Every structure is written in C-alpha cells, then in structure tokens.
Amino acid sequence: MATIAGCDRWSGGSGGAGPGATPASTQPSGYGAVFLAIDECSSFGTTSFTEVLCSSERAAARVIARYDGKVVDGPLCPATTDFVLHISETRPASDENGDGVIPQGYACMRKLERPHPGDPGGGGGPRTIVGDCVYSSGSGQVRETACDGQGKMPPEYKVTSAVVERAECPASTELYVQLGGGKPVGCARPV
C-alpha cells in the first residue's frame, strides 16, 4: 500500500514555504508502468487517493508532472498546478513495475473540472504566481486568496510581475512576494 498526502496550497507566507498536507493512502492500480505517472489520473477521497483511468467517472485530477524524492529537494511543480500529492515509499506485494517498491515522490495535479485554484487569481495552488492575490497573515507573511473576493479573506495585494531582483520591480510596487523559480521576486501592489 502506498501512502499519499494531498495539499491544495502551500502553508506559510511569502508564496511557498511548504505543503499543508493531509495524509491519505492508496493502492497501486496497475494502470501504468509508474504509479501516478504523467497524464494518469487519480480519484478524490477524504481518506485515500487511487489511480484510476482518466475516462472513469471517479477521475478527479490529472498528473501534470511527477518527481521522485521530496518536494523540498526536487523541482517546482508547474505554475498552474492545483495541488500536490506526496507519495510515501512503500513495498507492496504488487507495484507498478514488479520490483516491490513504490519510491517516495510527488505528483503535481490539475483538477479535471473547474475551479482551478492554481490558475492566476484562483486563490490556491501550491505556488504563488503572477496574477495571484495575497493578504497579510501577520509576522511579515502573506497567504494567497482569490482575487474575486470569494476566498476566506479579501485580497489586499495583487502580484503584477515577477523579476530576478527587487530593484527590477515597478515603482508602484508596495509588497515583495517570494515566488521561487527563475524570477523569484513577485512585485505586488494594492488591489
């Protein structure tokens, strides 16, 4: 049995400190050579996620990127990822390639239906990106919220551009948000 934890946004401020995960379990289904490989689908559940055929009525999200190892040690998920599934290493009786091991890793997931919290302004997703809105959560930290005001908290700032260094932000910038990636500084201004 493989154990998976799902998260729908990074906890912590500045655009991504770490995942807020909910542990869940799953059993390999045998649909692909690798458990939850790119373009395979998962079901949703309150206690488990399973690999299912993407044409199944149980399919809820598609894998858009898949990496071995821990999130903190690996590449960032694509910008419009809706949530991340964390896969714990297991040694089940049957697995994806017959070697007796499902390695630790993570799958970057995109929901099959709207809403997409990973879209710019969507109010969630594991990464803060250009077009997202944030609010102050205290102690110099910010959290993402929906730009349309439908989130738990109203938006205070919108990330309007991403740059390499703060000095490259427009003069109208009032808040700098840590984004990660090749342009790690988000330039934000009041909504």
Locations of the language-model features?
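C-terminal motif of bacterial Sec signal peptides marking the signal peptidase cleavage site
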Residues: 3-6
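Primary mode marks residue(s) on the alpha4-beta5-alpha5 output face of response regulator receiver
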Residues: 8-191
